[in-house]
Regions:
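Alpha-solenoid helical repeat scaffolds
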Residues: 1-167
Length: 167
C-alpha cells in the first residue's frame, strides 16, 4: 500500500498510512525516517524537522540523528544551529566521520575554505575513519575539484598522504 501511494506521489496518504502503522506498532526508527523522507519530498520542512527532532529526543545517545538534524538545518539556512550540533557531536565523539564530513560541508557552504580543507584533512587522515568512508569522501572531493576547475595537485597530495597511512 505504501509503495502504491508513493509511486503515485500521494504523499499525504503515505504519511497517513505510516501514522496508522505507528499507532498500532509504536514509534520506530524506520517509520520516523520514512516519514522524514516523505516530508522532505513534500517540501514540508516543519514536519521533517519535527520527525528528526523526535528521533533525537527518542534516541539521545545516537549521534546519527543529531548529525542528520544538523544537515537539515543547513539545508534550510539555519547555519548557526547546524554548526552547534556538529560541534556538540564532535565534542562527544571526536572521530565521528559523519559529523566531521558535515562540519567540512558547513565550512565550505559558509565560504571558510581554509577551515574546509583542514576539516577534510582531519577526516581523511584520521586512522579511525573506515577506508570505505574515506574513499567515498575522496570521490566527492575529486568530482568537486574537477567541477571547480582546480589543479589536481591538492588531490594527488591528499591521496599520497592517505595511502601512507593505509596498509
Amino acid at each position: 500500500l505504501l509503495d502504491i501511494y508513493n509511486r503515485q506521489e500521494q504523499y499525504d496518504k503515505v504519511i497517513a498510512t505510516l501514522n496508522r502503522i505507528e499507532g498500532k506498532m509504536g514509534k520506530s526508527e524506520q517509520l520516523s525516517m520514512e516519514k522524514f523522507r516523505i516530508y522532505l519530498q513534500m517540501k514540508d520542512n516543519k514536519n521533517a524537522f519535527h520527525e528528526i527532532e523526535s528521533l533525537v529526543a527518542e534516541y539521545p545517545m545516537d549521534t546519527r540523528y543529531q548529525v542528520v538534524l544538523g544537515d537539515v538545518y543547513m539545508q534550510n539556512g539555519k547555519k548557526d544551529e547546524a554548526y552547534g550540533i556538529y560541534r556538540k557531536v564532535l565534542d562527544a565523539e571526536p572521530d565521528n566521520a559523519m559529523a566531521m564530513y558535515s562540519l567540512a560541508s558547513y565550512y565550505e557552504a559558509t565560504g571558510q575554505k581554509e577551515l574546509y580543507q583542514r576539516q577534510l584533512d582531519t577526516l581523511l587522515l584520521n586512522k579511525k575513519v573506515p577506508s570505505e568512508t574515506k574513499m567515498n569522501v575522496m570521490r566527492q572531493f575529486v568530482v568537486q575539484n574537477e567541477q571547480d576547475g582546480r589543479d589536481s595537485t591538492r588531490v594527488i597530495s591528499l591521496f599520497d598522504r592517505i595511502l601512507e597511512q593505509e596498509p
